[in-house]
Amino acid sequence: MTWKIIADSGCDYRQLPTPAINTTFVSVPLTIQVADQVFVDDASLDIDQMMETMYATAEASKSACPSPDDYLRAFEGAKNIFLVTITGTLSGSHNSAQLAKNIYLEDHPDTKIHVIDSLSAGGEVDLLVEKLNDLIDQGLSFEEVVEAITAYQEKTKLLFVLAKVDNLVKNGRLSKLIGTVVGLLNIRMVGKASETGTLELLQKARGSKKSVQAAYDELVKAGYAGGRIVMAQRNNEKCCQQLSERIRETFPQADIKILPTSGLCSFYAEEGGLLMGYEID
């Protein structure tokens, strides 16, 4: 029995460290348009160059989702397929994936495909991909994996910490005044992905130290009790290490991974940003 785990580049993994038996992981890239340049978010992307270009232009940058054809190509070669997308509130990737699924099943009726809207990005998507791999590795049937991953998604959340908000300002999602204040006063925006997949501000913390404590407080308030965490970060390892230490003071057995953000997640998190997925009880 052949399996595929597919994720768009709202997931930070380019490949899985230890794929389950008979399982292939495929990353399907979104593209990021900065002025007249288009950056494809695959393993060859120079994220530093993309970010430099983005900050050098006054125009709003934007992302474009994979086409149904991109997903159709990714489906080939497996009988059991799971596909995880970035939240449908930020991208059309989920709609594109659903369309591709319907087209593919017309010609391949014996294939099983389950598409998951993560309602999130970054670390929480990474957790869902890791869990799918674990469930397949346990030898479960397709239907059992669907049931288990659906239940698991109810127990995962996303917390974000943003040190820069240039993109939000350029795209009109945040006022220029707030953007200026964030930059001048060293403010960090601490927020979460809501139940419907929108980004929701929780706190404003001044400086790195206070943002670490604010992130920890929100984590515990949301129900974290020592489970798995994936910190997807854009040039922010110091903050991640400090937050990891703070978490382990209370939960010494916490399983914490730190990953660099994909191009798309770097686009949203910006420099110094963190998109942290975590499990709750």
From Swiss-Prot:
**Record-annotated disulphide pairs:** none
MF term (GO), any: lipid binding
* Residue ranges of domain DegV in the record: 3-280
Q: Which residues form the signal peptide?
A: none
**Listed PROSITE patterns:** DEGV (PS51482)
Q: Where does hexadecanoate bind?
A: 63, 91
Q: Which UniProt keywords apply?
A: Lipid-binding
Give the InterPro entries listed for this entry: DegV, DegV_C, DegV_domain_contain
PANTHER family associated with the record: DEGV DOMAIN-CONTAINING PROTEIN DR_1986-RELATED (PTHR33434), FATTY ACID-BINDING PROTEIN TM_1468 (PTHR33434:SF2)
Function of the molecule: May bind long-chain fatty acids, such as palmitate, and may play a role in lipid transport or fatty acid metabolism.
This protein's name: DegV domain-containing protein spr0652
Q: Which organism is it from?
A: Streptococcus pneumoniae (strain ATCC BAA-255 / R6)
